[in-house]
Amino acid sequence: LRPLPGAQSVETVCTGLDGLVERAADYYAQGARFAKWRAVLQITADGCPSDLAIRENAWGLARYARSVQESGLVPIIEPEILMDGDHSIEVTSAVQEQILKEVYFACQLNGVLLEGTLLKPSMTIQGADCAQKSDPQIVAEMTVRTLERCVPASVPGIVFLSGGLSEEAASVYLNNMNTILRKAQWNLGFSYGRALQHSCLKAWAGKDKEAGQAALLARAKANSEASQGRYVPGSQPSSDEQLFVAGYTY
C-alpha cells in the first residue's frame, strides 16, 4: 500500500500491477490457484473515502483480477473498509455500496469473468468508536442487504475478512447471515486472520503445540458451522477480546 497522490493523507492505493501477468503465470506453474489483492479504504469525518480513492482502488482491483485470470488464477477481490472511526452502521453501508458498485463496474470494463472470482469484503458494521453498537442480527441483515444491492449473482462466493472483530463476534455475525433468506445464492464463508488465529497463538505461545492446535481446530469448527448457519454461540472455545487496533497496517 502506498499513499495516493491527490487524495487525503490517510488514503492509499495498492501497487504492483506491472509484470503481474508474468508473475501470476509463474505462481500458477508452481502450484498456486488463487491470488489476493487488498485495497484499503477508511471512513472519516472530513470526507474519506474520496471519489478518487474509491475509483483508483476499484480500478486496481479490477486490473489485478483480469491480470491473474489471464494466467489461470482465481482472484480474491478484497475492498476492505477499516473499522477506525465513530461512524454509524448506516454510514458504513452507504459507503460500502458506493465502493462495491465501483468495483464491479471496473470489473465489467476490464472483462473480468465474475464466475471465476471471490469477493472478500468487510462486514457492514459501525466504526469502532461509535457509541451505538449494533446487535449481531442487525449487522447480519445490513451486511446481506448491502451485498444484495451491489454484488452480482454470478459471483459464486463471498469470504469475509474479520477486520478486528473478536473471534466470537466474527463467528456469530457470519452464522446469522447464513440464516437469512437471500436473493442471490452466493456461498458466504470466511477468510479470517486474527479472528481465526488469536486463541491459537495465545495457547501455543511458542511452546505448547497441542494447545495451539486444539484452539485452532475449535475456531475452524466454529466458523465452518457458521458458514452453514449451524453455529451455536459459545459452543466452541473462543475469545471475546476485541482484536481491533486503531491505525493497524500490514
Summary of predicted features, one role per range:
Residues S9-E11, G47-P49, T179-Q185:
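Intrinsically disordered, low-complexity coil segments
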Residues Q8-A25, P49-Y64, E97-Q98:
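Glycine-rich anion/phosphate-binding loops
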Residues G6-Q8, A39-A53, I81-H87, A128:
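Glycine-rich, proline-tolerant flexible connector loops at the mouths of alpha/beta enzymes
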Residues F34-A39, G72-I81, V112-S122:
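Short beta-strand segments at enzyme active-site cores
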Residues A29, S67-E70, L109, R149:
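Residues at alpha-helix termini
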